[in-house]
Amino acid sequence: MNQKFNLKANNFIKNMLRYSYLIIMALLLNAVVNEIIVSANKIISVNIDYMLSGEAVDIGSIIEKFIYLTLSGFVLSFAGSRLSLKYAVRVINSYRKQISCKLYRIDYSYYDNAGTATIINKVNSDIAEAESFLTEHFATIITNITAALIYANYVRRINVVLFVAVVVSYPLVIWLSNILVKKMRDVSKVYRLKVDAMLGIDHEAIMGYQIIKAFGLQKYFENRMHKASEELVETEQIRTGISNTAIVIRRLIQWIPSILCAFLSIWLVRSGQLTVGELVGFVVILEKFVESIIGIPFAIVDATGCMVCIGRLEGILSAKDEHFGDKTYKATNIANSVSDENVLDEDYVIEFDNIKFAYKEGENVLNDVSFKIKNGENIAIVGSSGGGKTTIFRLLCGLYHASDGTYKLYGMDINEWNIESARENMALVSQDTFLFPGTIEENIRYGNINATHDEVVNACKDARIHDFIEGLTDGYETVISEGGSQLSGGQRQRIAIARAILKNTPILLLDEPTSAIDEGTEQLIQDALDRLCKGKTSITIAHRLSTIKDADRIIVLQHGRIVEAGTHKQLLDMGGVYAEMYGEG
């Protein structure tokens, strides 16, 4: 992934330009402050020459001017700082929202390829670095530029020779800073990857805490973390070394114009080309001029690490979006259909025609898969692990596109659908039920955000979970932790079923909903599923073949191909793959 700070197509810069009026105002105020410094310097310079020539000097007037200029400079500097901070906050807030929205639109394959810890690190740590770029480095760069221009004009007017002496070392500064920028960029990329790796281990340790304890893997994970931490520290030391080298070089280079100007000033004063007052004014402004002009490239060196982080964030924003059409439809048997939407009433709800799919090029997971599902049919998909069952569900949900072949939903090619509209026609109950941190009612209401409490209760009654919830101290307001770890597998499944009931969609996708449930709980869940599937088109990935005997049709997958299809009885009579699987079960 190209992580260079791309000026042509960079969302971060677009956000910077969006609020550029704020930073322009801050720059103008900063320019006025620097002009005030120059004006104060001129007052000192002129009055020293007056005093040395024997002319009278009004000390009181000079003090009044200095007080006025100092107060004005303080007020304007404060206002400029506030505007600069406001600019940074606005840009980062807009950029953060842009990234957050992108994460909901991004193609599902991005999440498959990027680690969870890496994405979290980018969204949190890299955003913080981007904010640091605006509040510290960018502000320093632009204020140094305005200051350098104003001071350069002042020094040039005092004496051109001194001006040349100040800028003579600048090519050396540019050359050295470019070298340091390249080194810092390379090291910063490695550093961010090391941080990702360490956070990845943390994430694994937290998510797999029970397994780690059960299998005694504490030492193994401690060693992994120790190694990752050491590698991170080593990279950080290199990064710090480059930064410290930049500081030392900057200080050494700053001495070059100072030494040159010291000798030249003596010669210019002696030759009468420079007055004592001008010399004093030059000496006072010299440090600020040198600091600002040399500070620009070295501020870029310091900002390089932040630019790498911005490049990583741009990687998210440049990732492929889910690509589908813009047509919006609802099936006629959805209870909450609205009149302003196109309504479909096709005989065939789902059609797969010679579907091929590969996660990696050349390694097909599905090969020439074809089937049609009528409205109201109860279909089961069975097969050995890795046969392509879950992949079919991912294609049905629009998480992936088929490599070849056609997938139609209600007679319309899936690529023509608005994907959100397509998914509104489906509800998923998975074997790995995910519950969000929050109350039980909130988790169920994700099926229909606008549902009333009574509707939630009715859904729970149909899902055979209402009595359990009512038995809890806080009932539906019971707060559950991430993943619902304090609930049993069966309880989580029934909450997921209640969520699907509340969504009230014509198509149900059931991904082995009873595979990890004991037989006692299985009957409760099966009863809930029967209520859920009544009058709906349902597709079930089955692990326990005993649960799908009543399916209208069973599709048998093997190595990504459909090898058999029929009713339970028909498949047993064939004596093929299904019969063998059923006998083994």
Regions found by a protein language model. Give the residues of each.
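Hydrophobic alpha-helical transmembrane segments of ABC transporter permease domains
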Residues: 36, 40, 58, 124-168, ...
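Transmembrane helix-loop-helix hairpins at lipid-water interfaces of multipass membrane proteins
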Residues: 21-79, 83, 157-161, 272-276
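An intracellular "coupling" helix at the cytosolic face of ABC transporter transmembrane type-1 domains
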Residues: 108-109, 125-134, 138, 183-204, ...
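Cytosolic ends of transmembrane helices, especially the final helix of ABC transmembrane type-1 domains
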Residues: 217, 241, 289-319, 325-326
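ABC-type nucleotide-binding domain
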Residues: 332-585
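Hydrophobic alpha-helical segments in the permease module
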Residues: 66-77, 170-174, 243-257, 263, ...
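Juxtamembrane loop-to-helix connectors within ABC transporter transmembrane domains
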Residues: 84-85, 104-148, 207
